[in-house]
UniProtKB/Swiss-Prot annotation:
It is found in: Cytoplasm. Homodimer. The gene is asnS. The keyword Aminoacyl-tRNA synthetase applies. PROSITE patterns: AA_TRNA_LIGASE_II (PS50862). One of its GO terms (molecular function) is nucleic acid binding. Its main location: cytoplasm. HAMAP family: Asn_tRNA_synth. It holds the Pfam family tRNA_anti-codon. This is Asparagine--tRNA ligase. GO terms for cellular component: cytoplasm. Its EC number is 6.1.1.22. It comes from Shigella dysenteriae serotype 1 (strain Sd197).
Length: 466
C-alpha cells in the first residue's frame, strides 16, 4: 500500500485492485439509502476529485464519515477499482477513512457554497485556492513557469537572479517603491532640509525594482544568453484589470542579437509554452473553455499555428488612420498605441499575432537603440488577438555617446548609471531583449479577465492583505 496523488488514480497510473492511500480535502459527500456514502476527495494534483465509496460497515462510519462536510481533510485507504458510474474511470473502495481535520462550523465555512463571485474570492484569498477556478489557475501558472524555464534551458540560456532592491530606475518613469529603514517620525535632514539618505540602510535612496533588465544586460555581456524571472514592482495608482503593484516578469537578454532576432525568440517561446500547457494541463484547460472562456483552448491552438505578422509602427498608424473605425483614443504618429488600437491590428486587420517595430523615440525608454532616422528606436511589441500587447522589447543602445544623449534628453543623471555605461566602454556589443508580464500571459491562457485572479495574493493600491 502506498500514498499516491489523486491524479495518479484518475489518470490510470495505478493498477486496478491496488491498495492505495490518498490524502486530501472533501469537496462533497452524498449518502445513499443503501448505507453507502460517496466522498469526492481532491488534493490539488489535478482538476477532478476522486470518488471514495464508503460502506456503513466501517467502524467510524456513523461517528466520522456521516459528519464530513466540504473542506474537511481526510486520509482514505482502499482498493482502486473501475468506476461503474459516469464521469471517471476509476474510484476507490474505501477500507479505512481517517479524519485529519474538521471544519469547525460548516455553516460559516467561507468556501461552503458551490459557486462564489470572483470579487468575493479576493476577500478570502487564503482559502480561494480550494476552488476549482483558482486551483486550476495555480496549476496552469506552475506549468507555464516550468515551460519557460525548460524553453530557455533548451535554447542555451542561463537563468540570472537579479536584485529586487536597486538604486536605478530602469524605465525612467519614477513610479517606484522606496526601501528605507529611516524612522518616519524622525527623518534625518541635510543642510538643504531634504531627507538625508546617507543615514539610511544602504547609504543612498533605494527602491524595489521595476525590472531586472539593466542588471540582466551585464550578464548577457558575459554569458551571451541569459534570462531573469522574478517579481517586479510598480507604484502606479492604477485600478485596472491589467495592473498589479507586484507582478512577475520574464526578461531574456541576448548578446550579438538584433531586433529581428528577439522577435523570432519571442514567437518561438510563446508557441512552446502554449503547446506545453495544452498538453500538460488538458483537464484544467478544458475547465477554462467550459466555464471561463469558450475560446481558451482554440485561441492557443490558432496562436501555435499562426505565422506572426510584422509591421512598422509608422505603417500601423497609417492602417489605423485609414480603417474607418472611430477609436476612443485618437490615432496619430507619435501616440503610444492603446489596447483598442493593438487589438484592432491583431484581431481585425492581420487576424494573427503581430510584431510592431520601430516606435517613436519619445514614447520609449532611454536604453532603446536609436535608428538611423533619428526619430525612431529599435523597439518592438508583440500583440496577441484577444489581449493586445503581451511582450515588449528592443535592441539596446550599445553606443555610449548616443546613450548619454538619450539620458540627457530624458532628464536622467548619467552618473547614476555609471556601471550600465561601463558595458559600452569595455567591449560593447549589440544586444537585445524583451519583457513578458507573467500574469498577463496567464490571463491570456486561461481567459481569466483580471490579473488579480492569476497571482496568489494580489498587491494593488490600498490592498496588501494576507
Amino acid at each position: 500500500m502506498s500514498v499516491v496523488p489523486v491524479a495518479d488514480v484518475l489518470q490510470g497510473r495505478v493498477a486496478v485492485d491496488s491498495e492505495v492511500t490518498v490524502r486530501g480535502w472533501v469537496r462533497t459527500r452524498r449518502d445513499s439509502k443503501a448505507g453507502i456514502s460517496f466522498l469526492a476527495v481532491y488534493d490539488g494534483s489535478c482538476f477532478d476529485p476522486v470518488q471514495a465509496v464508503i460502506n456503513n460497515s466501517l467502524p467510524n462510519y456513523n461517528e466520522d464519515v456521516l459528519r464530513l462536510t466540504t473542506g474537511c481533510s481526510v486520509i482514505v485507504t482502499g482498493k482502486v477499482v473501475a468506476s461503474p458510474g459516469q464521469g471517471q474511470q476509476f474510484e476507490i473502495q474505501a477500507s479505512k477513512v481517517e479524519v485529519a481535520g474538521w471544519v469547525e462550523d460548516p455553516d460559516t465555512y467561507p468556501m461552503a457554497a458551490k459557486r462564489h463571485s470572483i470579487e468575493y474570492l479576493r476577500e478570502v484569498a487564503h482559502l480561494r485556492p480550494r476552488t476549482n477556478l483558482i486551483g486550476a489557475v495555480a496549476r496552469v501558472r506552475h506549468t507555464l513557469a516550468q515551460a519557460l524555464h525548460r524553453f530557455f534551458n533548451e535554447q542555451g540560456f542561463f537563468w540570472v537572479s537579479t536584485p529586487l532592491i536597486t538604486a536605478s530606475d530602469t524605465e525612467g518613469a519614477g513610479e517606484m517603491f522606496r526601501v528605507s529603514t529611516l524612522d518616519l517620525e524622525n527623518l534625518p535632514r541635510n543642510d538643504q532640509g531634504k531627507v538625508d539618505f546617507d543615514k539610511d540602510f544602504f547609504g543612498k535612496e533605494s527602491f524595489l525594482t521595476v525590472s531586472g533588465q539593466l542588471n540582466g544586460e551585464t550578464y548577457a555581456c558575459a554569458l551571451s544568453k541569459i534570462y531573469t524571472f522574478g517579481p517586479t514592482f510598480r507604484a502606479e495608482n492604477s485600478n485596472t484589470s491589467r495592473h498589479l503593484a507586484e507582478f512577475w516578469m520574464l526578461e531574456p537578454e541576448v548578446a550579438f542579437a538584433n531586433l529581428n532576432d528577439i522577435a523570432g525568440l519571442a514567437e518561438a517561446m510563446l508557441k512552446y509554452v502554449f503547446k506545453a500547457v495544452l498538453e500538460e494541463r488538458a483537464d484544467d484547460m478544458k475547465f477554462f473553455a467550459e466555464r471561463v472562456d469558450k475560446d481558451a483552448v482554440s485561441r492557443l491552438e490558432r496562436f501555435i499555428e499562426a505565422d506572426f505578422a510584422q509591421v512598422d509602427y509608422t505603417d500601423a498608424v497609417t492602417i489605423l488612420e485609414n480603417c474607418g473605425r472611430k477609436f476612443e483614443n485618437p490615432v496619430y504618429w507619435g501616440v503610444d498605441l492603446s489596447s483598442e488600437h493593438e487589438r484592432y491590428l491583431a484581431e481585425e486587420h492581420f487576424k494573427a499575432p503581430v510584431v510592431v517595430k520601430n516606435y517613436p523615440k519619445d514614447i520609449k525608454a532611454f536604453y532603446m537603440r536609436l535608428n538611423e532616422d533619428g526619430k525612431t528606436v529599435a523597439a518592438m511589441d508583440v500583440l496577441a488577438p484577444g489581449i493586445g500587447e503581451i511582450i515588449g522589447g528592443s535592441q539596446r543602445e550599445e553606443r555610449l555617446d548616443v546613450l548619454d544623449v538619450r539620458m540627457l534628453e530624458m532628464g536622467l543623471n548619467k552618473e547614476d548609471y555609471w556601471w550600465y555605461r561601463d558595458l559600452r566602454r569595455y567591449g560593447t556589443v549589440p544586444h537585445s531583449g524583451f519583457g513578458l508580464g507573467f500574469e498577463r500571459l496567464i490571463a491570456y491562457v486561461t481567459g481569466v479577465q483580471n490579473v488579480r485572479d492569476v497571482i496568489p495574493f494580489p498587491r494593488t493600491p490600498r490592498n496588501a492583505s494576507f
